[in-house]
Structures are given as structure tokens and as C-alpha cells.
Amino acid sequence: MQLKSSISLKQQTLFRQHCLIDGEWQDSQNGERLDVTNPATGAVLGSVPLVTVSQTEQAIAAAELALVEWRKKTGKERAALLQAWARLIMDNQEDLAALLTAEQGKPLAEARGEIAYATSFIDWFAEEAKRIEGSVLQSPQGQQRLLVIKQPIGVCAAITPWNFPAAMITRKVGPALAAGCTMIVKPAEQTPFTALALAELAQQAGIPRGVLQVIVGDAQSVGKVLCDSPVVRKLSFTGSTEVGRILMAQSAPTVKKLSLELGGNAPFIVFDDADVDQAVKGILASKFRNSGQTCVCANRIYVQNGIYPTLVERLVEEVRKLNVGDGTQPGVTQGPLIDADAVSKVEQHIADALSHGATLLLGGKRHELGGTFFTPTIVGGVTREMRFAREETFGPVAPLFRFSDEAEAVAMANDTEFGLAAYVYTRDAVRQWTVPEALDYGMVGINTGLISNEVAPFGGVKQSGLGREGSRFGIEDYLEMKYLCVDLSR
């Protein structure tokens, strides 16, 4: 089937409009396809097949078959293949960034950065593949020798989001393949082309058929097949807490191992003794990166009373400079929101706050470019009764709360069911320790608005998820521990 392409790439084979199942590029068995649009222009970029239940089961069977040989490879052999994949990704960084911006909307500079960030996980876990270690235990019985070995958990599945369509895949696939597992990836329907391009490069790198597969389809039906299958031993999901709960329930009958990176409602606390310019810089990086569409975005900005007027003035000044537009254009710093539902949610949160007494300090409306573009917005006088305090906005809106002292700031920040990321700005050396330790969050940035990297463990507490990704701990979620007891009695 010949499919038209609206994206021009140096390596045109990276623009794949079929799913990768058992080493073959397949169309849907029932012919159903889904158009993928550019959120900046509304233009149709291409289409992808919606796989059937039967095709999902075929992918699971292929992953199970591929596991037999893949797990036998040494860590060094798996590392070499992962490193080859990483090199190809960076060799094709411009093409991948173009694909990513076209389907997701973020500025090209951010897209290039994401491709490099995505590659860092593959590089990191390629090295970790060679460092999977066991233990020798001191036995209480003299004639026995006790050992602990680690083995791949088996067939894994990943369900990934649209906001980081490259990095959220490699952060899961990297450790899975390094550990000796096989992986089925189900990317978001809004952004499948980046995932398919990564799979094409994995094939070029020599990763065997069935080891990495990418399927696109209805999230509910595909997700349920993956959860129901006893062959799939591990599921990794990045997305909303609501969907995470559903996947947990569906995985319970087969007692799967789960990694869940779920909703965030990140507090960003600025104390009176903070460096105002650094705090504003941190807010811009944390809140407005990717147009506010990240799980670790500053969703509630708490500013101490003494510094509040100065920070508001500086923040308004800097946010005015943000340039909204098509991410392919030079100088653009804010792309569109992903779809009309995202715009509607932003508008609802702003309207709710204003109806409860908040003040609009900047923006607050759709951008003159139309479509899903939204003006960067600042809302002051926000209180805990407003939706900003309870829900992720996932848009370019900075809601400002006031607080009087440290105890109040910590109490307000912890007043949520979520616990992914938090941020603290202060020059006080003691407070730099006491406040982060008191915050119920899995990650805390202190005098920085950017905390993500491949070296540190990424994940949350409470209803923000289970497990950690990245870091030396990330590979552990793809390994099973086995205890061996050897009796030497004659």
C-alpha cells in the first residue's frame, strides 16, 4: 500500500506509516487507519494502522519467541547493539527532531534537546547491561553456599505519552533491552511517528526481530490485551493517574510488575531570601517548557509575601518575551497545545480561578494564531479552593499563591494526592535541606527548575506512581532476583 508523506527527511525511510510486529512493517488486519495531524497547522501528516487484538497477540508471541535468544546474549553483546542504536539516533537527530516537532508541536530546539536526552538513556543503560551483579551470602550452615543472581523478567510492554514521544520510549526500552527483556511499545496515537522512526533505527542497528516492536491502536483495547496476557510480565506506563489506576486493576489478575509514572501537581516554592532572577528563570524553564505540557511542570507557584510583588513584576516582564508560533520557525519558544481538549482545560482552569477571586496578570486567552495556540498566562491571588490547586493544568499558565512562613509553604505544597516533583528556591543553607526533606515528593529541585537526566532516579510517591526510571536503579525493575542454595554435604 503506497502512502503519501507530507514530511521531507534526509532519510525518508524514518517516516514509517506501518506498525513493527515480529520484524515486519504491517498494516492493520481490518484496514483501519488513524490520521495524525500537525497541532501547529492542523494539516494531516500521514496515517498509522490501528492494530487488532489478533495483531497485539501476535506481537506478544513474537516477543516471547525473541526472548529465548535475546536473554542468552551477554551484557556486553546487548550493550554493543544498544550503543549502535544510540549512534544512529544521534546521526539522525535533525530528522527525528523534525518528525517530533511536526507531530507534537514543540519548538525544534526543544525537539533536538529531547532526541539527545532520549539517546542518553540508551547510552546509560548500555553500560548498565555490563554491570548486572549478584551476591554471595554468608551461610549460617557451613556446608552450604548461598548465591543471589539476577535474570531478565521477560516480555515487557510500555505505554507512552505524547508530550515526550522519544524520551519516554527510550527511558523504558533502554533498561528493558539492557536487562535481556523484550519490549512491545504502544505510543500515544497523537505522536506515533517518532516511535516508529526509533524502531526503524533499532532495526538498522541490528537489534533482532521481535526484541523491540511498536504497535499503534485503540488505547483501551490494546492496553487490556497487554494487561490480560500472562506472557507480559512487566508493564511500564507514563500518563495520568486515572489511567494508571485502570492499568493496575487490569494487571492484578496476572500479578504483573508495574512501573507507573503518573500525574504531577508540582509546587514551586520561592522564599523571601531567594534570588529573584534565578527563581524567574526557573519558573520559565519549569512552567513554560513544552508549553507547560510536562508531568514535572510547576503547577502551583508559592511565593512568600515579602518577595511576591518583585517576583510578579519580573515574571510578567519575562513571560511577555515568550514567542508563540509554529515550532519550525526560528525564534519560537512556545508551540501549540496538543489538541482542542488541552485548550479547553486551560480555559476552564483560568475561568474557575477568576470566578473565585483570582486576578489575571497576563494573557488568559487563545492566541491570535488560532488553532490550539494559547497565550502564555499568569494568574495572581490563587487559593487552595481553585482547580489550579488540585489538578494538573498541562498548559502555559503560571498560577501564583502567597504564603507567610515555611510551615505554611510545606503544608500547602503537600496538600495534594500527587507527589512527583517539587521545587524550592532559597539561599538559606539549612532550609535547602529541611524543606525538601519535608516535602512528600519523589524529586525536589533546589534552586533549579530542570531536574531530569539519565543519571538520577525519576519517579514519584503517593498517587504519582510506582518505581523509578533512569539511574543505576532503573534496570532493577526489569530484573528478577533468584536465590540459589548449594549444599556441599557428601
Whereabouts are the PLM-identified features?
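Hydrophobic face of amphipathic alpha-helices that form TPR/SEL1-like repeat modules
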Residues: 1-40
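Residues at or immediately preceding the N-termini of alpha-helices
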Residues: 39, 53-56, 75, 93, ...
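Conserved C-terminal structural/oligomerization subdomain of aldehyde/semialdehyde dehydrogenase
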Residues: 41-47, 232, 269, 323-327, ...
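Residue-level signal for inorganic ion chemistry
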Residues: 42, 78, 100, 122, ...
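Glycine-rich loop-to-alpha-helix module at the N-terminal edge of alpha/beta enzyme cores
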Residues: 43-132, 143
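Short, well-ordered beta-strand elements within core beta-sheets of diverse protein domains
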Residues: 45-51, 66-72, 158, 268-271, ...
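Rossmann-like NAD(P) dinucleotide-binding subdomain of oxidoreductase/dehydrogenase enzymes
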Residues: 134-278, 403
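ALDH superfamily catalytic-core signature
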Residues: 242-383, 446
